[in-house]
Regions:
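Short, active-site-adjacent cap segments at secondary-structure transitions
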Residues: 85-86, 120-122
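Mid-to-C-terminal alpha-helical segments outside catalytic/metal-binding sites
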Residues: 102, 107-113, 122-164
Length: 164
């Protein structure tokens, strides 16, 4: 793992990759992405405020435009973790796809990585539901699903399950 060696107040950051949960700090994240173009930055949790208990938020994708604006920075990728907890409908969470489609269109699938976030989300769904919502949807082609469910992660994190 790369150690974080950044002086965020300067333009110097020697870290290769930084993951940040930034739902209440999107303007700061934007500034960091701009100032550190050689650092791969990953937005966690779709960049959205994530609920910890039911009911789901009434406007779960309220900051979508701000999150999508981060796609302008080539050094920014996004984890689609916790997306199912943003749904106002039960499994298979059909109301998340319009907003996620905008994220996919802005970032491209090569900068989007799936994740369940099920350990935080046990009040909303189990692991199987978090996986199956993305495996059974007709909103993704097989190629898009393959990149989203692992291909992008292997590239962004330079990791493979075969490396051990």
């Amino acid at each position: 793992h790369t150690r974080l060696r950044c002086d965020w107040s300067s333009d110097v950051c020697s870290s290769e990759l930084v993951n940040l949960m930034c739902w209440e700090s999107l303007p700061l994240f934007t500034e960091l992405a701009r100032r550190h173009p050689n650092t791969q930055m990953v937005v966690d949790h779709v960049g959205m405020i994530q609920p910890f208990v039911q009911p789901a938020l009434t406007e779960p994708f309220a900051d979508l435009a701000r999150v999508i604006s981060l796609a302008a920075y080539d050094n920014v990728a996004i984890k689609i973790s916790g997306a199912c907890t943003l749904s106002l409908l039960p499994f298979p969470y059909p109301d998340i796809w319009e907003s996620l489609g905008k994220v996919f269109a802005a970032f491209g699938f090569n900068r989007c990585m799936w994740g369940t976030d099920w350990t935080r989300a046990v009040e909303f769904l189990n692991y199987e539901q978090g996986v199956e919502a993305f495996r059974v949807t007709d909103q993704l082609s097989d190629a898009e699903r393959s990149v989203l469910m692992g291909g992008a992660l292997e590239k962004i994190y330079n990791w493979s399950p075969n490396k051990g």
